[in-house]
């Protein structure tokens, strides 16, 4: 349960990271069930606190951002995501919202295939483009690869412009054969059929896609000029053009029929040719669909009725610890192999040591393992009645399994704070160069990856020893680009002290805390625990993190400070802040703006403003976008100055000119 706006913003960041890995990297970090639970908690918080909703929330957007591997291509009509329902009562509530106004509505029910959504554009009967869903507005152009999918027609008997949409999948049988080939060739195995389908569709070599035996199963249309009366009629038309028909498609009239259809699919799930993770329910009558419309993310006339997670019993035979990029330690259980949904499972996440203790999970326990959404397994609970005396307590590690440094143990999470830990180095450097840290132009994720691969850097100190010939070894680097990056790295020397503190990436210490620390001078990190606790806004966890971080990285920090020679203050920034109309003002942003609220918040904070989430008599300015809601009324009640986006931009521009 999310209890504060801080937890809400952290949840958004975490879910967006999970989505990036799932959609863009073909990598599932958590199970579908865990993601769904976290997502539903986010959604519940937003329903109770609509004024806090952020534009970058996963509830406000669809799918993924297109990567750089393929050209971006816009859809003629947006591709939407579906809202999920998880049980009979949620389905009943969803149906009632529709049937209350449209009692004659019927529903098309079909299997929800776990694959990659694809949009096919036909003009004058010819396939002209194939684009992945991406963020719903644009995706990756994969036309050449799509043409190698056997059941995608290159020509259809329809002369108008039409977008035909569906799911790219690989059958269970072909998935098993593909993984056997990869095993024999000493290549890494695909985790599941969805990852295999996604990776195969996004190959730079179309010949590889051709060998993967992908299939395209249509589920709808985008832009077209046909006059269908029903969704079922639309699907029948697609099949008449030469596309594959959807198996187990039914037209249902009420809740009882839908439930019967759903449970039939669950029974048939194991023998189905491809992996399923639910049933799609769509209002059949297109006039009702039109009247129901859409939310910001999804159609109101359709939903996905998710399948219950799959469980099996097995035994924990060992535990290993993995180190994440942030330094977080994740315990992973080694299991006696067990087959779930056609996959042999021998590992499952234990999430964190707090959860192990809470669930009383022990080594040699027989446990319930769940593989929801046919993806990553996790341990639900131990079966304590099977304990035979061989069980042992799973102990929290005291040192990092990678670098052997002492770990920071908090109530829930355990962290490696050693900046030189190989598992942390890359992410630490990405943060070091970021906009809110040293802001090194041109030093992004991909460049840092290459620098590591070429063994040119190990930590931040190595950046300042790079030479022109070093950078010329990197992909797509010529003399001008290499020199520009070297200049940017050198320019980052003599930074404001707060920027260098923030660049260190200390757990719980963000931009605001870094600015507070900078007020205490260049030796601030050497202060004692008692001295830190006296600082305004510094709690026990922040202080413990600071003290432990400095203890683990003293030599590195001293060398970095000596090399970069940070300034006690940034006169340019201070001058801009003090001359700003927003300096020391409390500001609230609300409504839909042309840029993410966080971007405006960052600009205003740089001008000395304090950004809060709620309007009160102490608020100085309310910045309003479209659909400002109750905060605007409250601002007027308290006599708060209200600026629209255009007025804000004018003031910001004027400050820039000064």
Swiss-Prot record:
Residues binding Zn(2+) are 400, 403, 416, 421
Looking up PROSITE patterns in the UniProt record yields: BRCT, DNA_LIGASE_N1, DNA_LIGASE_N2
Q: Which GO terms describe its molecular function?
A: DNA binding; DNA ligase (NAD+) activity; metal ion binding
List the catalytic residues: 112
The reply on keyword Nucleus is no
Quote the PANTHER family the UniProt record gives: CHROMOSOME TRANSMISSION FIDELITY FACTOR 18 (PTHR23389), DNA LIGASE (PTHR23389:SF9)
User: Where is each BRCT domain found?
Assistant: 577-658
InterPro entries, per the entry: BRCT_dom, BRCT_dom_sf, DNA_ligase, DNA_ligase_AS, DNA_ligase_CS, DNAligase_adenylation, DNAligase_N, Hlx-hairpin-Hlx_DNA-bd_motif
Q: Report the EC code(s) recorded for this entry.
A: 6.5.1.2
Instruction: Give the organism the record lists.
Output: Helicobacter pylori (strain G27)
The protein in question is named DNA ligase
**What is its EC class?**
ligase
The encoding gene is: ligA
Binding-site list for NAD(+): 32-36, 81-82, 133, 167, 306
Lineage of this protein's species?
Answer: Bacteria, Pseudomonadati, Campylobacterota, Epsilonproteobacteria, Campylobacterales
